[in-house]
């Protein structure tokens, strides 16, 4: 069951209290492109986080190791989601697969201790804001919300499109300019009343305006931006899913282009070479693609997988979340921070 990040100016969290709608972008263009040679020098992302210098993309069949301290206790099944790394700490959402999908935000420190930070949170995907707070895609109130990590207070950013609540906001990517791109499938729609007539990918401008990026992907899930912020990636579609790329010009997403077929896609991460790390939930693996959609590597885990983020001292540790578990693997390339 698939369930399902860039700096966010503080102003957007205090201003985006209402939203209006725009028409969806044009349908995807399915033309192919000839993949160029894989780069070996890391680019610098839009926020300046990627280090310059040599980098090596993963290749072949790899396996991530489970972080035992993060294992969920025996009992009701749980799903970990939306990992973000900051100041030596991994934060992620942890929700129960039961009525209402009750959720909390967990903190996994460098000392290996797992602590509950905020409960309840109603959260799924997470992103780090400029002021150190967390931006969360939530299903309890069907909104994007801002959480203060010190006092746990919550503030709505946006919660509806054309007068109706979202379905169950799932994952997001935040541009250096403060634009939020997020997916709205129906996986946790039953957590609260109301919803949309379709599942969609949305854009939230810095002025609070909500517009549709794509409504042709069934249950869009993972979403990420290229290091330079000029391409948006979205994965969704279930068993016969798709990884789709959209050029961003003047802050708006253009027609999408299908890069690869993916099975039960969930969350994503991007490295500083621009490679795309797409999880395949019930396939219990992550696949690494170059920006043209050519597969470079697979990373296996031992349970259903949901999402991914880079962290660690040099940002070369890939952390993976899934069914009551967190995994990690060291790579030869740093990640583009979300």
Describe each model-derived feature in a short phrase.
Residues 1-9:
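Bacterial N-terminal signal peptides that target proteins for export
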Residues 17-19:
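C-terminal motif of bacterial Sec signal peptides marking the signal peptidase cleavage site
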Residues 21-24, 30, 35-338:
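Sequence-structural signature of mature extracellular/luminal beta-sheet repeat domains
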């Amino acid at each position: 069951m698939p369930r399902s990040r860039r700096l966010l100016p503080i102003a957007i969290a205090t201003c985006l209290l209402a939203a209006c709608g725009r028409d969806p972008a044009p349908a995807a263009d399915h033309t192919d492109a000839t993949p160029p040679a894989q780069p070996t020098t890391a680019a610098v992302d839009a926020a300046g986080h990627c280090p310059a210098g040599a980098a090596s993309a993963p290749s072949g069949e790899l396996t991530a190791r489970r972080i035992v301290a993060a294992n969920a206790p025996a009992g009701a099944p749980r799903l970990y989601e939306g990992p973000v790394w900051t100041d030596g700490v991994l934060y992620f959402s942890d929700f129960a697969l039961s009525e209402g999908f009750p959720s909390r935000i967990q903190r996994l420190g460098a000392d290996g201790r797992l602590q509950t930070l905020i409960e309840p949170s109603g959260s799924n995907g997470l992103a780090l804001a400029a002021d150190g707070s967390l931006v969360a895609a939530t299903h309890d109130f069907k909104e994007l919300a801002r959480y203060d990590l010190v006092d746990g207070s919550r503030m709505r950013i946006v919660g509806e499109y054309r007068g109706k609540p979202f379905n169950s906001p799932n994952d997001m990517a935040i541009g250096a300019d403060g634009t939020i791109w997020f997916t709205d499938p129906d996986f946790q729609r039953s957590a609260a009343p109301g919803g949309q007539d379709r599942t969609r990918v949305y854009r939230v401008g810095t002025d609070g305006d909500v517009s549709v990026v794509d409504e042709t992907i069934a249950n869009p899930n993972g979403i990420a931006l290229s290091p330079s912020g000029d391409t948006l990636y979205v994965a969704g579609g279930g068993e016969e899913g798709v990884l789709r790329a959209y050029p961003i010009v003047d802050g708006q997403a253009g027609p999408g282009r299908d890069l690869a077929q993916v099975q039960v896609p969930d969350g994503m991460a991007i490295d500083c070479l621009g490679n795309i790390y797409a999880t395949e939930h019930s396939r219990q693996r992550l696949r690494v693609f170059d920006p043209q959609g050519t597969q470079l590597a697979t990373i296996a885990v031992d349970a259903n997988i949901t999402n991914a983020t880079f962290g660690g001292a040099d940002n070369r540790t890939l952390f993976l979340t899934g069914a009551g578990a967190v995994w990690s693997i060291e790579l030869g390339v740093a990640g583009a921070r979300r």
